[in-house]
Amino acid sequence: MRVLVIAGLLLLMESAAARATTQIHYVMGTFLRVTVDDPADPGVFAGCFARARALDRTFSRFDPMSELVRLNAAGGGLASPLLRTTLAQAMALRRQTAGTFDVSAGAVTALWREAAVPTAADVAAARATVGVVGLDGERIVLGPGTTLDFDGFAKGVAVDACVDALRAAGVTRALVSFGESSLYGMGAPRGARAWELDVRGPDPEVIVARLRLRDRGAAVSAAFGGDGRRARAQHAHIVDPRSGRPLSIDAASVVVAPSAAEAEGFAKAVLVRGDGGVAAAEERRGILAARVGRDRVELGTAMRATGTLRVLARVRRVEGEVALR
């Protein structure tokens, strides 16, 4: 069974096995697709989607009644175990990525979602709020002006929760995709060794590589086009927490990790860090990373050695990387 990833878009191909069952629900402002390749009662999907909706009620930044919106508005306070645990996981990833992934950069991200390009003073003020967050028992402590934005990371958390629900229901072969950029492959489709996904780069007509997933999470993060000023249209979801400015690059990252949430964090970090981002990510145990540019694909040492991401014949290798023909 193969799947297609198009600049962060995940689609089942026509070659997907007919015996697999797929359900798609709209959650967290995007689509959660679950494909099960086990003989299973349709009820196995219910637990998965229920967990995703519960997470949406916690992490949505659009629902004024979500726990996250209310916490940000209050400047911190008592928080549910789910929110505290997820924040602790995100804070650990912030340390592991040297601050290139940071859910406390909500003020900076929100600034670049506005229609007008912010002033340098606005950016500096928002940047000063990043990282001013802590856990104190059952409370989340936020500095003045600091807001949390879990965004894609929450989708990774939802994928992992969905996988847990499927396992509890006895499912061993499934592919979970959320927002068409965060995913997890459970086992492998019958008759195959892994879930296979085709990855396209900035040119939607060119399939760059093939990703193989088996009992691993993955994330695809992309920032193609733009000049770094029109963040609202093209870069608002990828802002460098250190500088407070959106990325102005033409690249995508592919990261494989033990969980989808970890993959989400490191996928953003690879892009934000730029040169050396792939190698830095792979310093962490269990992380495989790659970076796709307009003219080359950089494979991390571990990604290359395991064959998890295989560059297709239509591209050629150049000095440890891969140059597109």
Where are these regions (language model features)?
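Mature catalytic core of soluble alpha/beta enzymes
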Residues: 2-325
